[in-house]
């Protein structure tokens, strides 16, 4: 005989492991597959883009690309997107943008990448200009390898346009509130599996023993995979529009309520909000400090990775391994993050990220500044040189900082909005997104690129002590902001509970 208690237990356990109803699989699985394909491309692009720029132009060029090319390109892309939405149906907008990326990947794979000498200016001319105009030498070197700069920009835009905008807009449009509670967490878990899968694919395609194509075309199979993945995204989206959005059990436009538009604020209004509200200002400082501190360490780390892995293939394989660890750590933090939030105070949970950043950042810079001492005492024990150890510590720092962001940092930041009154909560969040989002993502790149313009003789080797000093100042300000916000947060929470 079946035991009812055991049956109930197994039923509850299955809901925890797979909270999707059987009939909902028709809707959930294609969406999860779409997100997996988008993230597969995203993580592959992230590994490759740095390999091309760092090894062919220099690690210093990344900060210039982020500040002067990626940022304006993102603004232009958003303007084009808004215009497309005015003249086309939402479904067709998706096809146009995805097809544009697919077309670019094909162009790069079969024209720009195989024939760099035909599309790039003469290297000697570029070098002579760089010597003649040292303050703008990084701009000149970027122009000299413009196809790699364009690839870097498109890689950055893929994450913004395809994942943050098109996929989530589609998901929010067709997902009911009760479905979202079960679907979205599962999306995160399944999609993060794309990162370790990317690592395996990159490791195989670029391995010296793998002979799929000629040696100088090693990256072509990866580009073919990205083109195929983009095509599968289009096909899946088309299938969902034909088969899911026509199924009344899975999609009813009347039940999926129109979401309220988020409050949008101008840059000036955002500054006013942040400077007039200490509480909102603290939250903005958290976001800015996170973005700047991550970028400052990441730039130095990538320059060290280049020293250790000087070829495109070796560098990209290493970045693939980085994606592998990042994927599993992100999944682990997603699973344990909610438990940490339930068992500790807001202050403790919010303090974990800056303290982790401080400790790992200090260890990373210590391995750079005291490499000769470390080489004397630890190399024999650990069987690795100081450069390899510095790169390893830098990878740990980057993996943890990104893993913690999606679980603890974002969660504690969003919790801080809850005690605010409705008006301040809506306007404050919009202000933080404008100021914190823009200055957090580009702040570190602006600091680094400005430094290299003012001091053209400096590279990352000479600039590291200055960037390290700025890093520690930023993290200390971050800790101060967490403590200050906690005082304000406790006062508001106590008021709302009374």
Curated annotation (Swiss-Prot):
Transmembrane region(s): 34-54, 68-88, 93-113, 148-168, 185-205, 219-239, 280-300, 321-341, 349-369, 380-400, 439-459, 466-486
Molecular function, one GO term: ATP:ADP antiporter activity
Chief localisation class: membrane
Membrane topology annotation: Multi-pass membrane protein
Annotated localization: Cell membrane
Keywords: ATP-binding, Cell membrane, Disulfide bond, Membrane, Nucleotide-binding, Transmembrane, Transmembrane helix, Transport
Cytoplasmic side: 1-33, 89-92, 169-184, 240-279, 342-348, 401-438, 487-498
Cysteine pairings via disulfide bonds: 37-85
InterPro entries reported in the protein's UniProt record: ADP_ATP_car_bac_type (IPR004667), MFS_trans_sf (IPR036259)
Extracellular side: 55-67, 114-147, 206-218, 301-320, 370-379, 460-465
Binding site for ATP: 436-442
Stored Pfam families: TLC (PF03219)
GO cellular component: plasma membrane
NCBIfam families linked: AAA (TIGR00769)
Function description: Provides the rickettsial cell with host ATP in exchange for rickettsial ADP. This is an obligate exchange system. This energy acquiring activity is an important component of rickettsial parasitism.
Sequence similarity: Belongs to the ADP/ATP translocase tlc family.
Listed name of the protein: ADP,ATP carrier protein 1
Gene that specifies this protein: tlcA
């Amino acid at each position: 005989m079946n035991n009812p208690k055991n049956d109930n237990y197994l039923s509850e356990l299955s809901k925890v492991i797979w909270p999707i109803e059987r009939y909902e699989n028709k809707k959930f699985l294609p969406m999860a597959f779409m997100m997996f394909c988008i993230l597969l491309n995203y993580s592959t692009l992230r590994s490759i883009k740095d390999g091309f720029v760092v090894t062919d132009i220099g690690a210093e060029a990344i900060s210039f690309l982020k500040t002067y090319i990626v940022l304006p390109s993102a603004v232009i892309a958003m303007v084009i997107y808004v215009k497309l939405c005015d003249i086309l149906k939402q479904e067709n907008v998706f096809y146009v943008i995805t097809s544009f990326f697919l077309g670019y990947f094909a162009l790069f794979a079969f024209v720009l990448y195989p024939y760099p000498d035909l599309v790039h200016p003469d290297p000697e001319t570029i070098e002579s200009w760089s010597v003649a105009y040292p303050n703008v030498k990084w701009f000149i070197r970027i122009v000299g390898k413009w196809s790699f700069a364009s690839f870097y920009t498109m890689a950055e835009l893929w994450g913004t346009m395809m994942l943050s905008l098109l996929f989530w807009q589609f998901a929010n449009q067709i997902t009911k509130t009760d479905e979202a509670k079960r679907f979205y967490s599962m999306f995160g878990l399944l999609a993060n599996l794309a990162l370790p899968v990317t690592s395996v694919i990159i490791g195989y395609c670029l391995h010296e023993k793998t002979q799929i194509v000629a040696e100088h075309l090693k990256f072509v199979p990866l580009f073919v995979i990205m083109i195929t993945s983009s095509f599968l995204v289009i096909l899946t989206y088309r299938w969902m529009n034909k088969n899911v959005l026509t199924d009344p059990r899975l999609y009813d436009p009347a039940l999926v309520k129109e979401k309220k538009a988020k409050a949008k604020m101008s840059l000036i209004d955002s500054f006013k909000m942040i400077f007039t509200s200490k509480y909102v200002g603290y939250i903005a400082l958290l976001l800015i400090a996170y973005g700047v501190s991550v970028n400052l360490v990441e730039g130095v780390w990538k320059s060290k990775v280049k020293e250790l892995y000087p070829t495109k293939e070796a560098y990209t394989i290493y970045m693939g391994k980085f994606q592998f660890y990042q994927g599993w750590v992100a999944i682990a933090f997603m699973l344990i993050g909610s438990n940490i939030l339930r068992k500790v105070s807001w202050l403790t949970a919010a303090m974990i990220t800056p303290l982790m950043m401080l400790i790992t950042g200090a260890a990373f810079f210590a391995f750079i500044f005291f490499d000769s001492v470390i080489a004397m005492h630890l190399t024999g024990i650990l069987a690795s040189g100081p450069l390899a150890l510095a790169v390893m510590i830098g990878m740990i720092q980057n993996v943890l900082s990104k893993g913690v962001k999606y679980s603890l940092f974002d969660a504690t930041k969003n919790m801080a909005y809850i005690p605010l009154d409705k008006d301040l909560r809506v306007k404050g969040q919009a202000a933080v997104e404008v100021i914190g989002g823009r200055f957090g993502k580009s702040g570190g790149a602006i600091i680094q690129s400005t430094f290299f313009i003012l001091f053209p003789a400096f590279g990352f080797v000479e600039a590291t002590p200055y960037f390290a000093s700025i890093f520690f100042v930023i993290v200390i300000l971050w800790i101060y902001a967490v403590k200050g916000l906690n005082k304000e947060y406790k006062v508001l929470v106590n008021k709302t509970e009374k």
